[in-house]
Amino acid sequence: DKYGADACRFGIMIASPAGNDLLWDESSNEQGRNFNNKLWNALKLVKMWEGRQADSNEPVADSFATLWFEHRLNEAKLELDNMFKEFRLSEALKTIYSLIWDDFCSWYLEWVKPGFEQPIDKAVYDKTVFFFEELMQLLHPYMPFVTEEIYHQLKERTAGDDITIKQSAAATATDASILANGALLKEVISSLREVRLKNQLKPKDTIQLHIETATTEAYQSFETILAKQINATHVHFVSSAVTGTISAVVQKDKFYLQSELELDTSSQKETLLKDLEYQKGFLASVDKKLSNERFVQNAKPEVVELERRKKADAEARIKAIEESLATL
């Protein structure tokens, strides 16, 4: 009565790892109730776009978002197929939970959400409803009541079109490059938001973003989404450092945030120095491992190659950080 049937089912299953005793705690039911609320809030957001679709003959700026989530959904389906075959039901629920809460609600819906009182592209809206339906099918065995209700509220159904008897679509092949670009976009957004916060730039303060990268194609594929998420009026691709800006390093790429406001570089310098210290320590640990002849001779070739890639990435990042520090 306190949490509801779906939340209790969720709480029991999320705390039931295969082969182990049940480590149930009432907080698991609270997590299930919060998940219920998250689903309803996502439904409310999507229903707000109902009747506000607009057909567009132009390339849709949010097309990367739908493409990425389609591949992310299929990637999760392939993982879930293996988990169900091995009866790893609790692990499967955790995968579905993360897919819905993190990838769909926290990222995808934010990427496709139109501006205030703006219409959403009809193709994007239809894809979003389809994704929501697919997610409810995946979650249905664990939380049957809320998923069935949301499934029917997403759009009108014919008699007998019930999620409980509907066959789920099989997973299709995924594209690793699209998934990698999605992961890159998430990392860049998170990093640049943190940079804005540390430099006391308010969410409403606009910036211009300059990107120094060897892989412009990846950024061009999601340029519009990135600009919207960090409130950038323009995105420029440059081949050298831009002075008078806030700089940041993500992976091997450098970002320069240009603002009309007066900038304090002290916090920016402190962040870069901390990152530089960490990267140098990480590089030293990798070097130590690679200088051990017993490790190189006895470890699997792919393990040694992975360590060498780690070394190359760390060296590239150290170089990028040092170049950013030089511009301050």
Say what each PLM segment does:
Residues 1-20:
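Alpha-helical recognition segments enriched in aromatics with Gly/Pro capping
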Residues 2, 23-328:
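Feature 926 captures the class I aminoacyl-tRNA synthetase adenylation module centered on the KMSKS loop
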